[in-house]
Amino acid sequence: GEFMVGSSNAFVVRPFGFHLDVPGNPGAADASGSVFTTAGKPFTASLSAVVWEAGDDSDADGLPDANGDLADNALAPNFGQETIPEEATLTHTLVAPTGGDPGSLDGTSFAGFSSGECSMSDVSWDEVGIVSLRAALKDHDFLGSGQDVQGLLPHVGRFIPARFSVNSNIPEFDHACSGFT
């Protein structure tokens, strides 16, 4: 065979996706699932920029499949070491209860990747139920290429109430008798 000999400029390859991990998350799919934590309590979420594997991209679109398991993909260790380092954010979608309050997700900015990984210990969700978490580049544009890097964790929870508020209810009675004749 023939070989190409020479050199080229340095090049960068976009990570295939983010593996998103929430330690201790039982991944409950409904109200009968195991409890993860209480509403509003901080938890840890970790993002790992990973490389492509055929089994996670069945439609060959360059993005992880919705059911893709990126946990075993190799790391993209240089992610986050760009001249202007890329950053990622988390968003959430309410999975259960249907019609529930989607609440607010805090601690969603991931910056300072090291060896392709970043972990935040102050992520919190202020409601009860189950959410899905989606990771994406903060600007949705890897190094000006127009391409995003994404990851999905379909079930995080079950989150339960942190406390209940009890108010006293002292009834007042109206006069019950009508006038006499």
Model-derived segments and spans:
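Core sequence-specific DNA-binding domains of diverse transcription factors
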Residues: 1-181
